[in-house]
Every structure is written in C-alpha cells, then in structure tokens.
Amino acid sequence: MTDKAGDWQEHGPQVEEAPPQVKRPPLFKVIILNDDYTPMDFVVEVLQKFFHMDRARATQVMLHVHTRGEGVCGVFSRDVAETKVNQVNDWSRQHEHPLMCTLKEA
C-alpha cells in the first residue's frame, strides 16, 4: 500500500490527455428580401458586386427572390455574413432603394 501511495506522490496522478474538441463556427445564410420598388437590374448588380456572382447566376437568384420573396446569396461565417448584410443595406440606401438583406443561421 505504501508503494502505491509513494508512486502517486513521486509521479503525480496518472492522467491521459484527451485531444481538444474544437467545434467549427456556425455558418450563416445571407438572405436577400424582395420588395416592390427595387429595380431588378439593381438586385443583379448587388449580387454581382457583393457576392461575386456572374450575370447569369445573379439573374437566376434575382428571379428566385422575385417569385419566392427571398433568396440565399451565400453562406458565410458570422462576421463575413454580417459584413455583407451591412454592405448591401448601406449600398441600397445610398442608391435610394429599399432592398434589404438579413442573415439566418444555416
């Protein structure tokens, strides 16, 4: 019995280290919302400028938004998604359009 107690005192407790459990950060969808006033060409321009879509893809997303009320522009980390939402909303206001983006957890 003294051997075991002596071992513990000399070498400390025997502990196995578990590998760290790192979670991926949550992703967020940037959602563009339809309105009755923003011209379709402006929406296409926004999708090309801020989401780097080619004209065909931007037109496809714009038509989806027009018919369904909203559409996904992309999926990003929270910081990037928030930045893109702010950029689109600011750009729209500067050009006097009510176009808005929001984000939802993916």
UniProtKB/Swiss-Prot annotation:
Q: Which residues form the signal peptide?
A: none
| InterPro entries assigned to the protein according to its UniProt record, in alphabetical order | ClpS (IPR022935), ClpS_core (IPR003769), Ribosomal_bL12_C/ClpS-like (IPR014719)
Please, which domain of life does this record's source organism belong to? Bacteria
Ranges where the record places region Disordered: 1-21
- UniProt record, GO biological process: protein catabolic process; proteolysis
Spans of biased composition, class Basic and acidic residues? 1-14
Q: Which SUPFAM superfamilies match?
A: ClpS-like (SSF54736)
Q: What does this protein do?
A: Involved in the modulation of the specificity of the ClpAP-mediated ATP-dependent protein degradation.
Task: Extract the HAMAP family matched here.
Answer: ClpS (MF_00302)
Describe, as the record does, how this protein assembles with itself and its partners: Binds to the N-terminal domain of the chaperone ClpA.
Q: Give the family, as the similarity comment puts it.
A: Belongs to the ClpS family.
User: What name does the UniProt record give this protein?
Assistant: ATP-dependent Clp protease adapter protein ClpS
